[in-house]
Amino acid sequence: MIEIKPYIEHAVLVGLITPSQPEERTKEYLDELAFLADTHGIVPVKRFTQRLDQPNTATYVGEGKLEEIRQYIIEREESRDEGRELVDVVIFDDELSPRQIRNLEKAINHRDRSGSGAKQPFGSVRVIDRTILILEIFLQRAQTSYAKTQVEMAHLQYMLPRLTRMWSHLDRQRGGGG
């Protein structure tokens, strides 16, 4: 008999060290985030931290740290033959704005395959924040249909502004009429 194992997601965790959140507290928060990920069935494989005065408004982390995260994901993809699993999700410790999620997903899910500097899509690594992770845990554990509906509503209300303009590349496409 063939045994089918459930797919286990692997995650990268990201946190910031700021003047109001010292390194030790960031480490504690990332430990808690790792526990939440594990509770949801996601295996944390790497942690990234960056020291900033405040989060980058466009991408939460700086350009160099974002590139470091992206390169780590690419290296894991390229070393799959060595038994390393792909990174499926990047989890940020703080709440991300809709713009930050879009920018992060765009940056993380593109890479240069030709050597020409042109970036090509290479995967669908999800970007989520602590709140989304907690909502997903609640949804996973909800027992009654009412509870599932309530959690799903909360999740959708949280995600609505994050989905706005997701398909903005279609904005200018209009049907022609004769």
Segment roles from a protein language model:
Residues 1-134:
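N-terminal accessory targeting/assembly segments
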